């Protein structure tokens, strides 16, 4: 980072006015001499005259010198102001700086403020990139936990619709401390700009053109009067598109590999959706009150409603070696429906110069549905002489869940002295989730009904000390989890899981066999009907050692954490994927224990990150065949004894005149083993990422960006992912002193995004190809009147539980 101070006038070190004033005072005090009055004969008179004359002279000179000094000061002041007018300060200081174990990125007044959306801003921060869904993700650490003005973001659309010009700065924490939950690998703290009095309005609208036309609109109102701030938001988003997916599962039986006396059972399904759409309504309202200059309270309510039907045509076939056993066609539909209501309240107060207290409370009510409407017909059945109606497999499956969450959190910060501080607190969540899966007609499968209740309590503490150039942060987190799962009988009195399209099966206990197949009847190892009660009491230490020398900063951290299975992974309801594939949860999953080591360094605009992670009881998805029907497979989850991975990331961003490039590159390599085709096999092919953003600051405030992103092929768990790349174009312009902004984005210009996977677990090989319409043109218009910041500083204490229950 280079600093330049260029002055066309005289460069003066110090204040010349004060220098001259000091000289004037010295002259005034020492300019009167008494040597002319030193005659001996008139000593007494001289002494009297001497005293009087000195006093008079001093007074006269003092008055004159003061006037002269004032005039001189005035002239010097004028000269100094003229010199300052000629001063030009130029600098290209870095947009990023290390602070308290995190990286603070300036957004306001930088080129990042030109980005069209907050998502684009977050994806360009050190150590961040876009995932396959277009959301920001930490290359090391995964999906981030995001806060806006200390309030945890529960619905990502809040980030998507946050105007970039409202963002002041973002702090990136790649090694979260003891305060953050075990499921958090990265934290983004967004701080918005200072609040303005009066009414503030932000209207944000976007239109996206691909095979269809999609749009989104939201209106954000904030009113501040004195110590009170009221705000509300109302938004609607509609997305339309199409997609196509092909799934092929090959089950090798009676042999260790293809061609080695193995019988190959192949099942393939192609899902072709010509028109899928997504309607989302979202809203929020709240207020905060500054009780005093140091104490604030607030309350906020927010919610959403999502409706997403996806009709598709399905064509499937089943083969044994080279013989086609059956062809199945169908007109099916997925129907997703979700809603959520969330209330949050908070208190924040400062006490003296040393104490800061925060209290948060939450109540969440949410509902999710994943309806499936199946209407298929089998050529094999028709060939056997049955009627078309009898050959038709038609049913409805409705998995749904209702969740209730109560949460509370308290945190205290105490400043011991200017070098030491202490943070401690606790949190508690009560979770109740009721899940069921119902079939219509009832003889098409076995309905399930279960209730899960959890009590989750945690206490945490961190001690920080600064001994320049080093600083140390030591943390400890304690967690107690009491989880209870109970299966209920449905209306017919049945419990357990049956196969879709089959008659009800008895409750056998054959379980998962040594070959990885699912036994007849219920999946005992996956979904036993007996109640499950689990308790966990664990300690999780963390440590961060930082060092800073000028522009060079580095840190080394360690963190122990736990990843608990989501409610979807635990849910024993069966989800219909396609004619030959089902999905079912595993209620016996155990939490994964993680140990993360990370090194981080930055120098000016250069950022480096490296990590090593060891995971015990790693949770991963697998495919296992049905022993009665080797062409039918089940996607489920299981615990792997252990795995580990390492990764490294390098980023650089700098501006030279009108050109501002950003380069990001990284590598990830995982090491995991499994029995594959009868032999133990390691999966450890690395994959790389590379992205280049070319920003051009054009005349009259125009900003243009041409970008390229690439991800190589490599292994992720047991699956090999294909390489993918894309080119994007962006043009941005603001008007009316940034009150109005217009952005044009062309995504995936050459339509090159294609996703392919190929994986083997046990004796099953699974291949998938997925295509969706990713080439699009997006136009976004944002208008801001009296732009203001929401003062709400609440923090969602129930976010982890909401995420595990499938909430947004």
Q: In which residue ranges do the predicted regions lie?
A:
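Short acidic/polar hinge/loop motifs at secondary-structure boundaries
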Residues: 124, 149-176
């Amino acid at each position: 980072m280079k600093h330049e101070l260029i002055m066309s006038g005289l460069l003066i070190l110090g204040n010349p006015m004060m220098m001259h004033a000091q000289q004037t005072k010295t002259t005034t005090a020492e300019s009167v001499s008494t040597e002319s009055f030193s005659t001996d004969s008139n000593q007494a008179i001289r002494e009297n005259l001497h005293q009087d004359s000195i006093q008079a002279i001093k007074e006269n000179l003092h008055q004159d010198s003061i006037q002269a000094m004032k005039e001189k000061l005035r002239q010097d002041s004028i000269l100094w102001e003229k010199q300052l007018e000629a001063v030009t300060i130029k600098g290209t200081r870095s947009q990023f700086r290390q602070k308290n174990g995190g990286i603070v990125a300036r957004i306001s007044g930088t080129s990042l403020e030109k980005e069209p959306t907050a998502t684009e801003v977050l994806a360009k921060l050190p150590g961040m990139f876009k995932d396959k869904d277009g959301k920001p993700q930490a290359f090391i650490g995964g999906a981030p936990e995001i806060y806006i003005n200390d309030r945890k973001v529960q619905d990502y659309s809040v980030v998507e619709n946050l105007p970039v010009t409202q963002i002041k700065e973002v702090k990136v924490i790649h090694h979260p401390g003891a305060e953050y939950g075990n499921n958090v690998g990265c934290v983004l703290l967004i701080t918005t700009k200072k609040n303005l009095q009066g009414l503030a309005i932000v209207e944000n609208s976007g239109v996206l053109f691909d095979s269809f036309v999609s749009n989104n609109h939201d209106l954000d109102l904030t009113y501040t009067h004195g110590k009170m701030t009221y705000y509300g938001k109302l938004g609607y988003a509609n997305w339309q598109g199409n997609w196509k997916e092909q799934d092929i599962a090959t089950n090798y039986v009676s042999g260790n590999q293809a061609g080695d006396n193995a019988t190959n059972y192949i099942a393939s399904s192609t899902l072709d959706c010509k028109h899928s759409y997504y309607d989302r309504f979202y809203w929020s309202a709240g207020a905060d009150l500054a009780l005093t200059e140091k104490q604030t309270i607030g309350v906020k309510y927010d919610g959403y409603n999502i409706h997403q039907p996806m009709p598709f045509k399905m064509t499937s076939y089943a083969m044994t070696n080279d013989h086609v056993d059956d062809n199945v066609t169908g007109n099916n539909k997925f129907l997703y429906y979700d809603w959520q209501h969330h209330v949050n309240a908070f208190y924040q107060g400062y006490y003296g110069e040393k104490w800061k207290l925060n209290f948060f409370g939450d109540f969440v009510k949410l509902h999710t549905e994943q309806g499936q409407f199946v209407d298929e017909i089998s050529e094999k059945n028709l060939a056997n002489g049955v009627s078309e109606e009898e050959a038709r497999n038609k049913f409805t499956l409705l998995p749904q869940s209702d969740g209730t969450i109560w949460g509370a959190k308290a945190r205290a910060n105490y400043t011991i002295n200017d070098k030491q501080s202490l943070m401690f607190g606790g949190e508690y969540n009560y979770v109740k989730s009721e899940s069921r899966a119902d079939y219509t007609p009832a003889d098409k499968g076995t309905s399930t009904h279960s209730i899960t209740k959890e009590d989750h309590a945690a206490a945490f503490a961190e001690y920080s000390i600064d001994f320049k150039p080093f600083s140390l942060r030591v943390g400890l987190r304690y967690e107690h989890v009491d989880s209870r799962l109970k299966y209920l009988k449905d209306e017919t009195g049945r419990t357990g899981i049956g196969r879709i399209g089959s008659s009800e099966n008895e409750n056998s206990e054959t379980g998962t066999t040594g070959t990885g197949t699912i036994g007849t009847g219920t999946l005992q190892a996956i979904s036993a009907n007996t109640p499950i009660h689990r308790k966990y009491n664990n300690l999780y230490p963390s440590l961060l050692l930082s060092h800073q020398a000028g522009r060079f900063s580095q840190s080394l951290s360690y963190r122990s954490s736990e990843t608990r299975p989501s409610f979807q992974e635990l849910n024993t309801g069966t989800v219909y994927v396609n004619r030959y594939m089902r999905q079912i949860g595993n209620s016996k999953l155990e939490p994964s224990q993680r140990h993360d080591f990370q090194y981080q360094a930055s120098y000016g605009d250069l950022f480096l990150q490296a990590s090593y992670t060891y995971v015990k009881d790693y949770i991963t998805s697998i495919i296992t065949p049905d022993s009665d029907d080797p062409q039918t497979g089940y996607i489920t989850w299981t615990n792997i004894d252990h795995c580990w991975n390492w990764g490294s990331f390098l980023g650089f961003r700098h501006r030279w005149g009108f050109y501002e490039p950003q380069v990001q590159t990284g590598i990830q390599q995982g090491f995991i083993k499994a029995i594959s085709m009868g032999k133990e096999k390691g999966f450890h092919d690395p994959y790389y990422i590379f992205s280049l953003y070319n920003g051009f600051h054009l005349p009259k405030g125009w900003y243009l960006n041409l970008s390229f992103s690439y991800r190589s092929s490599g292994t992720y768990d047991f699956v090999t992912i294909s390489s993918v790349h894309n080119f994007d174009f962006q043009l941005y312009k603001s008007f009316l002193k940034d009150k109005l902004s217009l952005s044009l984005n062309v995504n995936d210009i050459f339509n090159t995004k294609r996703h392919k996977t190929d994986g083997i677990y046990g004796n099953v090989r699974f291949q998938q190809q997925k295509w969706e319409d990713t080439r699009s043109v997006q136009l976004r218009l944002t208008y801001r009147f009296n732009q203001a910041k929401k003062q709400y500083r609440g923090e969602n204490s129930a976010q982890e539980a909401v995420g595990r229950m499938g909430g947004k």
